[in-house]
Amino acid sequence: MNSYERVMTVFQHQEPDRIPLIEMSVSDQIVKAFGCQDLYEFQSKYYDGITVRIAYRTLQDDGPFYQDEWGITYKYPQDTTGHSYHHPIQCPDDFKKLVVPTADDPYRYNYLEKAVKAYKGKKAIIFSTRAMFLWAVELCGMENLMVQIAWEPQLVEEMLDKIVDNQILIARKALSMGADMILETDDYAFNTGPLISPAAFDALFAPRLTRYVDAIHEAGGYMIKHSDGNIGSHGYMKYAMINNIRPRQRP
């Protein structure tokens, strides 16, 4: 049983020869400590799946800060993950200015194309992206997003529809190129519980997540849901697998 067969056996609810290992991200320090040049070499040696992230271009680079195609400004990370520093949606009028980066740009899938060519049928090919929540957070800022959910729910819903429609196209494209599954990486919680109320999740996010998951299944792929924190009742969706960083507790 090779790595691909091992992972797919688990997703088909059968017993493999051993537990497969997959991971969405590894610190550069760990990668280098194991003598690998990059994350993909590390995954090829030690994991049963190759996880590749969607790629967005850097449009402005001012040393410690850079801006991507969404108009979000980030601060360069000391470790692995950059953090948004400036959010382009500051007020209700800014919602109308949102232009979602196109889904059909080949640049989005550069790493995926290479992974499929090298590992298709040998290891599970996992394409990592978001559905909507963290894009909304980074476009608006967390506090501002919560305020807009209360004050301008219609504008928030229109923004979420733009984002999730775009991400559905991206997921379909990735699967058509040879990805076996989609790893969706929106964080919905911190250690003590969800970031948003069950009512807000059910009203705004659950219907769109359902549409997103259904689109992946209809395209023949599997869905892995990643989230930091204790997601509580948010975890009831139709996921094939949950990659949860903190213990998940049902109420």
Predicted regions and their residues:
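Active-site loop segments of alpha/beta catalytic cores
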Residues: 1-36, 76, 99-251
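Secondary-structure transition motif
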Residues: 21, 48, 59, 72-73
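Short, polar loop motifs at secondary-structure junctions
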Residues: 56-59, 110-111
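A contiguous, low-structure linker/loop signature
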Residues: 60-106, 118-123
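Catalytic domains of carbohydrate-active enzymes, especially glycoside hydrolases
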Residues: 40-57, 173-177
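Glycine-rich loop at the start of a catalytic domain that most often binds anionic cofactors/ligands
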Residues: 32-41, 65-68
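Cofactor-binding catalytic cores of oxidoreductases
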Residues: 23-25, 54-55, 68
